[in-house]
Amino acid sequence: MRDAQNNHRVALALPDNEQLQKTPPMDNTIKGLLDREEIRNLRTLYAHHLDSNNIAALDQIFSTDAVVEVTVGKMEGVDAIRAGMDDAFKLFDRDRRSSYPFIHAIANHWVKLTGPDTAEGRCYLIDFETASKPDPNPLLLLGLYADEYRRIDGEWRITRTRLEVVWPERNGASEQPANEAKDA
């Protein structure tokens, strides 16, 4: 009986340093999953920062030289992106609540790692208006973001994004991903 108890204790013991040193480094599959999750989080944080009027935090999402093409126009560089998003926020904040005049819901986000520090992806956008307006329908638009990402100084950033609106009116959305159609 005593031997069984001792064997049980040994089985629960923590590994020693020699055993830990034999543990292989992080598997590439796990690293890829962690990279994809960090990248997906960029788009979620973008929606949160924009909707809550935390425009200053967009430098945590975009590279300094990022290019953004959305319904309010094309912006190049993080300062232009902040200015453009600030103008869009003011335009939709008709009730002057200073937060959440719209809510960006992000869904179906896929990410493809194209290199050790580059990736591309797409996700759906369901954009709701929460500010008062004559039309009681809160749905503003449906669209798809096509993004390019790069790891800069150890942090993932969006380097290029294009919003394809598919409803209420299409703005050039096609079956070809915007990632591939950017030079067309």
Show where each model-derived region lies.
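Short, charged/polar micro-motifs that form catalytic or ligand-binding hotspots
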Residues: 48, 71, 135, 139
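A structural signal for alpha-helical segments
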Residues: 34, 73-76, 137
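A beta-strand edge to alpha-helix "cap/lid" segment located at domain peripheries
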Residues: 22-27, 97-184
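A solvent-exposed, acidic/Ser-Thr-rich amphipathic alpha-helical stretch
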Residues: 55-125
